[in-house]
Amino acid sequence: MTAVGYKRIATEEAWAPMELLDTYRSMAAKKSIDDPGFIALWTRLGARPVLSERLADIGDRRIADMDSSGIDLQILSLTSPGVQVFDAQTAASLASSANDQVAEAVRKYPARFAALAAVAPQDPRGAAREAERAVRRLGLKGLIINSHTRGEHLDDPKFWEIFEAAEALKVPIYIHPQGPPPQMVGPYVDKGLEGALWGFAAETGLHVLAILRSGALDRFPDLRIVVGHCGEALPFWLFRLDYMNKTARPFIRSGADRLKRTLSEYMRENVYVTTSGMAWAPVITFVQSVLGMDRVLYAMDYPYQFEPDEVTATDNVPISDADKKKLFQTNAERVFAL
């Protein structure tokens, strides 16, 4: 434990095997995928060798970076877009291999790493089986899904076997951004906004909101969803979302009129948010005030936003010592059963 009186547990920390990163770079260079957002993003990221080295290292170099910034434990998750840009068979094989690799790192460094399991939503039943293997046999602490899968979102009931598995296993699903899908991405790419600057939040906020309105959380009331970047703007919009969801129902295409709870109730009862990339006291304290102190977890967003000074900035958020311990340590321990 660091000298501040709590462990700093970072909950959205990316990794990937180098061979997967090489595949992304090749796909972007050859434009072998019909996804302008992916091509734009991995053309840029693929030109950053130090970033790739940090992503691929789940050993001594990463731990040295953690030590230099005061991070006690990282929860590792397969970087975006994970396996979700491949065909179902390839995706399932890559997910299983990645889970085996990251589980080995956790076994080697149990005091420094925990990890989430990658699954392939392309095959929901297979994803549910892999979730059970990864949690029960490998000891992984939840699932990572990098938002849309070839333009499809988890509000579609065909994916709900994944929700059923996560609820039965009592593990959360972390919905992490990727770039907007082809049917959405055009203006974002044209304006250079497809990545973390704006497109990530817009796409992932849409995805999570669609899940809230789908009825999935009535069918799976104990399902827990984790969302980064202080909630992808959804906490800021909760009042208006509730108002419009109520007053505009006759004009809204979906089953929203059959929901058992308001959208804000689903957010406060089923969703947790992390501070990844948002080391700014006004935002952190706002989200805590909206969702509650028990529902906000610290994250760094390593290695994409490896800024050790931001750890100190988050230490200095004007909340009580007890609430800082929740933010950095005990909320993560509870949500991920650490």
Segments (PLM) and residue ranges:
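Mid-to-C-terminal alpha-helical segments outside catalytic/metal-binding sites
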Residues: 1-9, 16-73, 100-108, 129-133, ...
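Generic beta-sheet signal
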Residues: 11, 118, 174-176, 228, ...
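Surface-exposed, active-site-proximal loop segments in enzymatic domains
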Residues: 79-94, 125, 190-193
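Catalytic pocket-lining loop regions of alpha/beta-barrel enzymes
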Residues: 106, 133-291, 295
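Charged helix-capping and loop-helix junction motifs
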Residues: 91-99, 155-162
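Divalent metal-dependent hydrolysis catalytic cores, especially in the metallo-beta-lactamase
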Residues: 43-50, 63-86, 112-120, 141-145
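Short glycine-enriched loops at secondary-structure junctions
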Residues: 121, 177-183, 302-304
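Alpha-helical scaffold segments that form or flank carboxylate-/histidine-based iron centers
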Residues: 117-122, 126, 226
